[in-house]
Regions:
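Metal-dependent nuclease catalytic cores that hydrolyze phosphodiester bonds in DNA/RNA
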Residues: 1-115
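Mg2+/Mn2+-dependent nuclease catalytic core
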Residues: 83-155
Length: 155
């Protein structure tokens, strides 16, 4: 039997619309929405901004102003892999014959120096819709689950 492939976006689709998920898995894909270049470009700019601070082992001022006491994840080559949609995070779940793959934007490390905190840049071209917090919360939980399956401590 083939391994069932999941991703944070596929799980989000299931949570939003189980029928849409079933249709997607059975050959009727949802049409792709327009992907505006501004949010995609901002995502890249934010990653580069955080990477500059990471290379100096410093926190970006946005995190300092928010009172964050930890640090940025320091392993840039590993983070680059985890950001890549073809390599990304991989959580094998042989007990249910499934694998979950996803690409993360960034990681923070709690002040204990061990606990990883998934971090995602939200750069939407429009105002957030009602209930967006739940969607993003679930997305971060899925990234946390994947990191735990990979052997990391997650907060």
């Amino acid at each position: 039997m083939a391994v069932f492939k999941l991703s944070p976006s596929a799980i989000g689709l299931f949570m939003d619309c189980p029928r849409c998920f079933w249709l997607d898995r059975n050959g009727t894909r949802r049409p792709d929405g327009m992907f505006p270049s501004l949010p995609g470009g901002m995502d890249r700019v934010l990653k580069e901004h955080f990477d500059r601070f990471r290379s100096r082992d410093a926190l970006p001022p946005e995190l300092e102003r928010a009172g964050f006491k930890g640090s940025l994840f320091r392993n840039q080559p590993l983070l680059d892999d985890w950001r890549d949609r073809f390599r990304g995070l991989v959580a094998d779940m042989p007990e249910i014959n499934a694998v979950c793959r996803g690409a993360i934007d960034d990681l923070l490390v709690d002040e204990d120096g061990e606990t990883l905190i998934p971090f995602d840049f939200k750069t939407k071209g429009t105002a957030p819709t009602e209930g967006y917090e739940d969607h993003y919360h679930h997305q971060m939980c899925i990234y946390g689950f994947m990191l735990e399956k990979m052997g990391h401590v997650v907060g």
